Structure formats: C-alpha cells, structure tokens
Regions:
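N-terminal regions that are enriched for targeting/export leaders
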Residues: 32-84
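Short loop/turn motifs that connect adjacent beta-strands in outer-membrane beta-barrel proteins
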Residues: 31-32, 54-71, 106-118, 169-172, ...
Length: 464
C-alpha cells in the first residue's frame, strides 16, 4: 500500500482514535512475565553515547568523570529540500544547526545526600531557515508541523535548564527544583530522532504552555516510584510565554509569568513478552493562566467585533498519552530489533487551535547484519484543528465579504493535516551519523487548497 493510499485513509476523522485503541489494546493484552533480562531502552530509540570525536581529551574527560562531572557535547544540523508540491514551488534547501552541552555534576559523593546532583543544558542554535514557513505552507495559516524539528526561529545561545535534584525514602521519592525543562522528567516515552516535529518526542508540548527543549521555567517536581516499574509524577512550574524570547535566554527573572502550570503523569516501564522493554505514560496539564477563546467574545458577541475582546478562561486542561514498545529482538541481541510507538493528545479547543494530535510509527535497529547499528524509522502524524478557531476564521471572512482563496484578505480555513516520514540512519563511526529522510505533507497547515508536498531531508549528528 502506497503513501497516497495511507493518506486517503487518514482523511477520516476517526483515524486518530485508532491510535488510542491501539494503545489501550497493546497495554491491556500484553502480560508482564518474570525475567532476568535487563531493561535496555536502546531499541526504543534511546541509544547510549559510544564515545566522542575528541576521545578522552588527553585525560581530561576521565579526570572530570572521576570528579563526578559527566557531559555530552553534540552537534546536529538539519537540511530540508522541497522536491515537489507545497504552497510555493520555488526550490529551496533550508539549513539549521545547533550545538548542545548537557551535563550532570554528582554531589552525592561529596555530601552523602542520596542522588544529589546538579544538571544543566546550554544550547547554541543558528539560522532562521525554515522550509515549512518559506515553501510548504500558506503563510496565512498557523503551523501544524515542521520539516526541521530543531528550528528555533533565531540564532541564539541560551540556557536550557539548571536544576538541583536529590532523593528521599530509600531512593523512591525524587525531588527536583530550579530552572527546569519538561524533558527532564515528563513525556519521556518517545525519543527525538525523526526530522519532522510531530514525530519527534511526545505530544505534551502541543498544549502551547511549555517548550520541548532549550527553554526553562522556574519550578519543582516530585516523582515517586510506586513499584520498580511504575512512577507517579507531579510538578509546579511558572506558565510564562516570555521564556522563549531572546531577552530571557539567561534571565533569572520570572517577569512575564501569567500563572502556574501543574503537570501530572503516570509512567510505566515494564518488560513485556518475557524480555522486551517498553515505556507507557498518561498525563495531564492544568494551568490557571488566562487563555483567550479563539472565537467567542466576553459580551457574548463574536470576539472579532466584541468591544470587550475575546473571552478568557483561567482553568484549562490538556491530556496526552504515549507508548513505545520493543516488539522483536534479532538474534538474541537485546540492542537489535523493532519497536512500535504511538502518541495521542487532546486540548481545550476553545483556546488551543490544535484540537487533537496523534502520531504512530516504527523503528528498527540493526536490520542488516553488515550494519548492526544502523536505524530505519517510519511514522505518520495527524493534526485536527479546533472548531472554535475555524469558526472565527469563517466569521472574519464573512465580515470582510471575501470567499476567494486567492484574495489576500481571505483567511484559509484549516481542518486537518497529515505528515509522513521515512528515514535511514547510517552509523558511520561511534560519534558520526548521517540520516537521510523522505517526508510527505498532505494539507500543509491543514489547508486543503495547498498542494501536497514531498520533502527530502538530511540530518547530521556529531558527538564530541
């Protein structure tokens, strides 16, 4: 079955619910068996570093590690080329890159405090080159995906997080405090190896209340290990839309905070089918920060003409779930085989233009004996747009008396979009990887008038 056939099937609105059903069925019918196998997330997409380009740096790295300082210095670039279709057919190769330093300083060895550590992340991003914005999508529409997930909108060096953590209760209760990013504790089921954004990680960032990467929020998190496999998590963070701005790259201030964000999650990390690891989570977010209605006004009129502006809500929720399960093992090697992943999220469509989003796909590590560390990945994402948002655009078109899509005053009406991606990642050396990919965009930005697009991508990764 071709990608076009798959796309036509996705035009039905019931498709996202199949992701949910698949998630429930896999969890309900799989039985956890007692096994001596080690829980190894490699085939799930979480591959441990195997050494860097700079080696031990004349003994510096081992000396730092002996002092409890562990770090990862990595470089990534992403290229995307519009091979066919899209809103603008002029050819362009968009390029972005980033360098990241992620580190942990073990404090337990010096203080005796269980699991005490300082963790930090610094990211340098370069270039505002965005194929989705410049070629694939109508500029009048809001984004539903990215062809280069690492695009950050600017060249900047900024703090991603800086936190202190420790444990209590015989290392069952874990506490973190400081300038934190959600990736440290929440929504960790799915890794970020695809180049399209919606296949990179889970769906919790689609709430629009926090960022996936390299932006921090003041807050604190508690995690409790209910069993060796099951963990409950809860946090309190500032809800601050200013944190992604340039002026807040290194700021300690909480100016701009609109309220608090309360994330909660239950995570399960079992060994299923006797020996195969998996990660399952279900979570919610609550915020009391003001959220503007996308359609209705404060006085009961349409917000576009209401003298008091759009209605605001001070209690908003967001729900997400995900799983990532290894389903095969090749030649009794726990680090070779296939994994299956899926994620699903629902928002408050009164104030979030994305009503729900879903993704599903597979990864295979070591399919070929001659290339045991290479990866193959394939996935599909679906975005459904809020009825409130669409209603407001329809009203604006009526107000302006325009119905012609080609009229600059016309607001295109989005409904849903589908993005598919296939990649192959070559492990050239333990520290150098090349990952060509092919992307298919159906209804970019959710706009049916925009021609489907084919994109050729290339991701390059270096570990130092």
């Amino acid at each position: 079955m071709g990608i076009l056939s798959l796309t036509l099937k996705f035009k039905k609105n019931f498709i996202p619910f199949l992701f949910c059903i698949m998630n429930v069925n896999l969890t309900a019918h799989a039985e956890t068996q007692k096994t001596n196998a080690k829980w190894d997330p490699t085939v799930l997409g979480f591959e441990s570093p195997q050494g860097g380009l700079l080696g031990d740096m004349y003994g510096l790295r081992p000396a730092l590690e002996n002092a409890g300082f562990h770090y990862s210095l990595a470089y990534v670039n992403e290229i995307a080329y519009n091979a066919a279709g899209g809103y603008n057919h002029d050819k362009e190769a968009s390029y972005i890159d980033q360098v990241s330093l992620t580190f942990t300083q073990d404090l337990e060895r010096y203080t005796g405090i269980p699991d005490a550590a300082i963790e930090g992340n610094i990211v340098n991003r370069n270039h505002d080159s965005n194929l989705r914005r410049d070629r694939l999508q109508d500029s009048r529409a809001l984004r539903t995906d990215e062809s280069q997930e690492s695009w950050g909108g600017q060249s900047i060096t900024r703090l991603g997080w800086l936190t202190f953590s420790r444990s209590f209760d015989d290392r069952k209760l874990h506490w973190r405090i400081g300038m934190m990013n959600k990736l440290q504790d929440f929504d960790q089921a799915i890794g970020c190896d695809f180049q399209t954004l919606n296949l990179c990680g889970g769906k919790s960032a689609n709430s629009g209340w926090w960022y996936n990467w390299n932006s921090y929020y003041w807050g604190t998190v508690l995690k409790y290990d209910l069993t060796s496999e099951l963990t409950a998590k809860i946090g309190v963070m500032e809800q601050n839309p200013e944190m992604g701005s340039r002026r807040r790259a290194w700021s300690l201030s909480s100016d701009g905070s609109k309220g608090f964000l309360l994330p909660m999650e239950l995570e399960w990390r079992p060994m299923l089918f006797g020996k195969l690891p998996g990660i399952y989570n279900i979570g919610t977010q609550f915020t009391n920060s003001p959220q503007a209605d996308l359609s209705e006004g404060k006085s009961g009129y349409p917000g576009a003409i209401d003298a008091d502006g759009y209605r605001e809500y001070h209690r908003s929720w967001y729900f997400s779930t995900a799983f990532n399960q290894q389903i095969t093992q090749k030649d009794d090697d726990p680090q070779r085989g296939m994994s299956l992943f899926s994620s699903l999220a629902f928002s408050d469509q009164r104030s979030n233009y994305i009503r729900y989003s879903a993704s599903s796909g597979i990864r295979y590590r070591g399919l070929f004996d001659l290339r045991p560390e290479d990866w193959i990945g394939a996935g599909v994402s679906y975005i459904k747009i809020s009825n409130h948002y669409k209603g407001n655009l329809n009203y604006l078109n009526e107000l302006n008396n325009v119905s012609d899509y080609s009229n600059p005053l016309y607001n295109p009406i989005p409904d849903h979009s589908v993005t598919a991606e296939v990649f192959y990642r070559f492990k050239i050396t333990p520290w150098f990887e090349l990952q060509p990919d092919l992307q298919y965009w159906y209804h970019p930005g959710g706009i049916k008038e925009t021609q489907a697009a084919w994109v050729i991508g290339l991701k390059t990764s270096l570990n130092f």
